[in-house]
């Protein structure tokens, strides 16, 4: 619900578009003269956990004030502004999984599917969000629970 408040309080128009071949872009944000943001993301890579992380990463750029009025912000993750990228990553991580509870979950060290599902339920996210983060942070291998990772696609593919 916090995220819906963010969208409403910042006035964000949101769209998901097809990724085009060769484009390194995960997201694009512009701000109109009236202050309304337009945020566009793709389902590049198709994994649902990556989509949701990317969505909250882009929201992080808005909340953190990275987009000036009348300018475009193309998030290519090319390392040109590591501080902004790290801050947006942190916003996404903390929005999806509450930091203290995630630290406690890691401390317990139980990464069974049952433990992951139970923890995901306490965070109001799908288990694939937790699985993706555990994989990214190398707590589990990328092959672990891969059958439980949802992939998005376009209806006419």
What is each stretch, according to the model?
Residues 1-3, 8-157:
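Active-site hotspot residues in diverse enzymes, especially metal/ion-binding acidic/histidine motifs
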